[in-house]
Amino acid sequence: MWRVKKLSLSLSPSPQTGKPSMRTPLRELTLQPGALTNSGKRSPACSSLTPSLCKLGLQEGSNNSSPVDFVNNKRTDLSSEHFSHSSKWLETCQHESDEQPLDPIPQISSTPKTSEEAVDPLGNYMVKTIVLVPSPLGQQQDMIFEARLDTMAETNSISLNGPLRTDDLVREEVAPCMGDRFSEVAAVSEKPIFQESPSHLLEESPPNPCSEQLHCSKESLSSRTEAVREDLVPSESNAFLPSSVLWLSPSTALAADFRVNHVDPEEEIVEHGAMEEREMRFPTHPKESETEDQALVSSVEDILSTCLTPNLVEMESQEAPGPAVEDVGRILGSDTESWMSPLAWLEKGVNTSVMLENLRQSLSLPSMLRDAAIGTTPFSTCSVGTWFTPSAPQEKSTNTSQTGLVGTKHSTSETEQLLCGRPPDLTALSRHDLEDNLLSSLVILEVLSRQLRDWKSQLAVPHPETQDSSTQTDTSHSGITNKLQHLKESHEMGQALQQARNVMQSWVLISKELISLLHLSLLHLEEDKTTVSQESRRAETLVCCCFDLLKKLRAKLQSLKAEREEARHREEMALRGKDAAEIVLEAFCAHASQRISQLEQDLASMREFRGLLKDAQTQLVGLHAKQEELVQQTVSLTSTLQQDWRSMQLDYTTWTALLSRSRQLTEKLTVKSQQALQERDVAIEEKQEVSRVLEQVSAQLEECKGQTEQLELENSRLATDLRAQLQILANMDSQLKELQSQHTHCAQDLAMKDELLCQLTQSNEEQAAQWQKEEMALKHMQAELQQQQAVLAKEVRDLKETLEFADQENQVAHLELGQVECQLKTTLEVLRERSLQCENLKDTVENLTAKLASTIADNQEQDLEKTRQYSQKLGLLTEQLQSLTLFLQTKLKEKTEQETLLLSTACPPTQEHPLPNDRTFLGSILTAVADEEPESTPVPLLGSDKSAFTRVASMVSLQPAETPGMEESLAEMSIMTTELQSLCSLLQESKEEAIRTLQRKICELQARLQAQEEQHQEVQKAKEADIEKLNQALCLRYKNEKELQEVIQQQNEKILEQIDKSGELISLREEVTHLTRSLRRAETETKVLQEALAGQLDSNCQPMATNWIQEKVWLSQEVDKLRVMFLEMKNEKEKLMIKFQSHRNILEENLRRSDKELEKLDDIVQHIYKTLLSIPEVVRGCKELQGLLEFLS
């Protein structure tokens, strides 16, 4: 009994367990052979069905088959299994990406149902061969042929990795069967075939019944060998892909690796029970194929000539052939109806289809295939059994060799028409074109499968002519008739095989090209899947990172909002402190203005003092005249006057020394006061600069919050500054008018001199206290400035972080730019008006400066003139005093004798000179200089007891009057002395009172003069400070105007950027519409693909093959979205980094400037504090200075 050894196949990955294997429409074409029966039934001598019809699942009357059919069935089963392996491999690739082995084992049944195939466990696609092992001797003929179709279920595996070869084929050996009616069974090695597509099921020519199959002619063999040369079109055999897609143009590049070989029949070896495994190889040269075919035919003829068929009628009597044989004979062997190829048959059935017309233009063979339209396919030689009893020749036998050739020519001509116009290289086609070709081939195959089903149903009906033609009578003939019968049958079999080979060659070439192409497309699809999975993983990681970053940014934004609120609170506190400092400065300015008014009043009183001095000089002239008259009467008093004059010189020297010291002290005080005032002005200016710096910092913060508020605040500040300056100017005008009125009424204020002096002392004390307060205030301001510096440093740090998010707020602010533009226009108009006002103020300031210069020059000239007059008057006085002293000295020389008497008699009680009053100006000077010099001893002045005037009065009374008569002279002298004593006492008293009043007036006038000079200097400094303030205000306005212009430019640039962004948005919208259209197109294409794939599926199977397309489309969409998101996030991050860097640089520059300004302010405040500490005690009594010291401390 024959056995078939199955070696392991390995194909594409198997589907997962639990999932039904998907079945393509062409899977239904691989139907079961009809020669399957139980072991008890006998097989016929030869079958009336061809291997192609057996492959379609057609049955004869009995379930037996001939040896020829057995061998043909073995060959077709091998090719169909190759095809089914590749189809199952694609189907399983659609379900999972991991490769799992398949084990295709077709189950052969006697009914025309579809074959169920299992899964092959391996995956290496190596080609193994079938080895037929002879059964033990004595078995019956039906056991030989009946199975050994069951064992044909175990199939050969096909190598996809290398070309097939036939040099290393395993030779199948057939042992002769021991029996009465069989001579031997010759087994010829089966030649390899290509992986045949289902087209060979349709185009293989069926042989005639056994009586006609034994006739063979040399012409058919020669035609067969000639067709081999034309059929050697190369094709690639290393890639097998699904059978559901068959029609694509073959590639010339892929066709270069295909070779065809035949086995040399001389290498056949007959053995019993042997089993060998070899690899398969195709022939490479057409000459070898011709010689091999001729050798094959000769070997068959030699074997058949030695064999006999004794009992063919008996076997035919057991056979019940069906009507399918006659139908096949009609289709393939009749003269009226020629054999057609499957595409021609499809064209005949679907002649009105538009799709077929498109396929005619698109699906056609290249020029190489058109030239090689008729080719030979290597086929397996049949194991022929011979009988001792030859069968009788049939009357109704028909020779199908000619009709078979005609059908082949017809089919090749039709395939040439259908396969013309294709490009030679499939790799040049796009993916869309390949998909369209696949869809069209699927439609063709679907229609083909349906028509094949119809054909099978038609062939299932028995026909009496085929039944009559296939019957044989058990009659014995001579050896010559048997040999002729065998030759006829072999000739007819050769013709049928030649026709099938020609048709199959064309189908194999196309299927091989298609399989290789589909394998490449699957490789690309796998690569796309891997890339998509990698991109999806990357996108998932990127999305996770983005979400983490967003969470961190939200937390940081909340913290920054809290810090921003704290910064706002601190800013409010700083503004409050600034307002308090401005209030203190306003109070200080008011006090300074009061002090200036008081000094101006003192100037008026000084002028009055000058008039009084002139009156005093006139009175002194009158007194000198009276003294000359009295000198004649007071000759006796010259000696006393001389002594008094010496004492008076001593007093004069002391007085001049005191005056010089007082002048030096006053000059030092004036210098110190000037320095203090200058330092105060510098401190005020620096304080203003600090306030300006703070205003700038606050302005920058407000610019981040909103530029509109900053402009309004700056406008309000400028308005308040202008109003304050205008008020100051009005006050100055009013003060000037008041000074003029006070100058007119200065005569009325002479009576209030003492009270004014008291008020001056009190005001000095108040000023000292105020200076101390101001020092304290400056200290407090310094501490607050340090605190504000720390706060500003923190705020700057906070601003560095808040400015990152200020950009996001700026995006919202872009919407408000329209309103801001209107406001900016209005502010520009207001600023232009204010610039005009500032220009007018510049003119007024220049006029005021000119007036100040003129007044200062006038005052200096007046002061110089006054000093010259005073010096001249003092010179005259000194000359008069010197003349008086000389006159008295001459008189004293003449009367030296009377000096002793004057010294003895003039001894009245002396009085101590009173200490200088603290309320006088001299007392204040002495108390101020007490720390530097020791207290000087009191010196007798003009009105004291030690002065010369008192002694003169006493001496005059004792002066005797010399007369010729002693008694008369003594009486007259006594009378004269009494009169002189009374007169001298009166004169002395009047002189002392006048001198005292004059001394007081001189001291008061000197104090007033000094005070007025100080006032003038203070007024001049105040005016200079005001001028500087105005200049600074103008500079600030110019700076503000420049800053506003820069802000306007920036806003214009932002507006232009917005316009550009709007254009970009329009372009983006257009791109979005284009993308939506392309997306709709892609959706329609995916729907069509899904429907096409769903159409491929069997109605009994679940639609699982379209899931991978949906997954791929979804993955590609997700990858595109994530890629766009990643690019957007990257661009936004770069923009934020650039903005952050620019803001950071600006803030660092501002911080550096603010640090410098704060250092300057600290130095200024420290310098002010030191200078205020070095102020003399006279000025320390001012309350404002004391308050300032307290503030600074």
Swiss-Prot record:
Function comment: Essential component of the mitotic spindle required for normal chromosome segregation and progression into anaphase. Required for chromosome alignment, normal timing of sister chromatid segregation, and maintenance of spindle pole architecture. In complex with SKAP, promotes stable microtubule-kinetochore attachments. May contribute to the regulation of separase activity. May regulate AURKA localization to mitotic spindle, but not to centrosomes and CCNB1 localization to both mitotic spindle and centrosomes. Involved in centriole duplication.
Q: Which organism is it from?
A: Homo sapiens
A single Gene Ontology MF term assigned here is: microtubule binding
Q: Which residues are in coiled coils? A: 545-608, 759-868, 979-1174
- Where does this chain mainly localize? cytoplasm
Keyword hit for Coiled coil: yes
* Stated name of the protein: Sperm-associated antigen 5
Q: In which tissues is it expressed?
A: Highly expressed in testis. Detected at low levels in placenta, liver, pancreas, thymus and colon.
Keywords in alphabetical order, please: Cell cycle, Cell division, Centromere, Chromosome, Coiled coil, Cytoplasm, Cytoskeleton, Kinetochore, Microtubule, Mitosis, Phosphoprotein
Subunit composition and interactions: Homodimer, with a globular head domain and a long stalk. Homooligomer; the globular head domains associate, resulting in aster-like structures. Binds to microtubules in the mitotic spindle. Interacts with DCLRE1B/Apollo. Part of an astrin (SPAG5)-kinastrin (SKAP) complex containing KNSTRN, SPAG5, PLK1, DYNLL1 and SGO2. Interacts with KNSTRN. Interacts with RPTOR; this interaction competes with RPTOR binding to MTOR, resulting in decreased mTORC1 formation. Interacts with G3BP1. The complex formed with G3BP1 AND RPTOR is increased by oxidative stress. Interacts with OSBPL8, PCM1 and CDK5RAP2.
List the GO biological process terms.
cell division; chromosome segregation; establishment of spindle orientation; mitotic sister chromatid segregation; positive regulation of intracellular transport; positive regulation of spindle assembly; protein localization to centrosome; regulation of attachment of spindle microtubules to kinetochore
What compartments host this protein?
Answer: Cytoplasm; Cytoplasm, Cytoskeleton; Cytoplasm, Cytoskeleton, Spindle; Cytoplasm, Cytoskeleton, Spindle pole
